[in-house]
Each structure stands twice: as structure tokens, then as C-alpha cells.
Amino acid sequence: MELDIKKLTDLLQNNKTVCPCDIKKIYDERFIVLEKGRCMIRNIHVYSSAARFDNKTMFGVIKYLYKHNEAIIDMLFPSKTVYNSIREIAPDYTVSISTDDTEPSNPVTVLLNIFNSFRFGKKDAPVSYYYLPFGKDVHDVIS
């Protein structure tokens, strides 16, 4: 029996099958962003550095996540001048989790998704103090 690799690869990608090697890679990464639909996580994006507000990298990641939804972009970036001045930051790689293609339309839901999307992968990896929230035990906050 001959196995058609192209068909198998297409089947796995279309059904959003996640392999254990992908899970291991995600677990070993330090900075991940969860892209959420209305009901569940759609994609996990891996970045080489943490997104921050002070250097506008947070806005670049958000611009990448919602670039295909004009209503959300207009809500998050009311000024086109500001939107155009921000550089879109693509992830190092992405692992697709589900086929949930619904977008939240409520502004509160969108903002909650954004604020709950940024995660640290490895707990034991050292993280610079300026990436950490205020608090005595950070791992309880982000886990």
C-alpha cells in the first residue's frame, strides 16, 4: 500500500491535528500568544521575545492577530495614523489547534481575549524583571 504524503499532510492540516512534537515545542518555548475565537483557542503563536507596551511590540502582535478583522482593528486602533505607524509582528511559528473561525464581536470579549492571550511557556526559565507583573509569586499569576 502506497501512502500519499501530500494527502495525509493536507488531512492533518485541514482537521487541525496537533502532534505530540508540536506540544513539546510549545511547552519548551518561553513566550507564547493564544489566538482565541469566540469559543476556544484557534492557534498558538510562538515569539522569541515578550510583547511589551513600552516599545509597542504588544500592539504589533495584536495587529498581526486581528489583521483580517477590520471591525476589531477599527475598535482597537481608532486612529489610522497610529495603526499605520505600528509594525506588524509575525510569530516565529504557529501551531493550529482548532477550526473555530468565529471572531468575538463584543469589545469587552476582544479585550479580555487580548489580556489573557500572552503567556510564558517554561516556568523554570528565567524571565527579565521588566516582563513580569507586580507580585511576589509570578508563577501563580500566569499559570
From Swiss-Prot:
Induction details: Expressed in the late phase of the viral replicative cycle.
Family that this chain belongs to: Belongs to the chordopoxvirinae D2 family.
A Gene Ontology cellular-component term: virion component
Organism: Rabbit fibroma virus (strain Kasza)
Localization per record: Virion
Domain of life: Viruses
Statement: the UniProt record of this protein carries the keyword Oxidoreductase: no
Main location: virion
Name recorded for this polypeptide: Core protein D4
Pfam families: Pox_D2 (PF04701)
UniProtKB keywords: Late protein, Virion
Function (record text): Late protein which is part of a large complex required for early virion morphogenesis. This complex participates in the formation of virosomes and the incorporation of virosomal contents into nascent immature virions.
Transmembrane regions listed in the UniProt entry: none
